[in-house]
Amino acid sequence: MAKKSQIVKWLKPKKYKVREYNRCRICGRPRGYIRKFGLCRLCFRELALKGEIPGVRKASW
């Protein structure tokens, strides 16, 4: 989990639009971001396995 000060820093509007980048809403991780859900791959996997993301389930074939 990210520190409170880091979260506040990320939420501040950037001076230039180019400097904005995607971060996970839960943990603040910048890498492995899934744009459709606004989560990183790790948080997405956890929530999907718990069944907390509607319409998502583990693939089986």
Curated annotation (Swiss-Prot):
PROSITE patterns: RIBOSOMAL_S14. Disulfide bonds: none annotated. Zn(2+) binds at residues 24, 27, 40, 43. GO terms for cellular component: cytoplasm; small ribosomal subunit. One of its GO terms (biological process) is translation. GO terms for molecular function: rRNA binding; structural constituent of ribosome; zinc ion binding. Keywords: Metal-binding, Ribonucleoprotein, Ribosomal protein, RNA-binding, rRNA-binding, Zinc. Belongs to the universal ribosomal protein uS14 family. Zinc-binding uS14 subfamily. Binds 16S rRNA, required for the assembly of 30S particles and may also be responsible for determining the conformation of the 16S rRNA at the A site. Part of the 30S ribosomal subunit. Contacts proteins S3 and S10. HAMAP family: Ribosomal_uS14_2_B. This is Small ribosomal subunit protein uS14. The lineage of its organism: Bacteria, Pseudomonadati, Dictyoglomota, Dictyoglomia, Dictyoglomales. The gene is rpsZ.
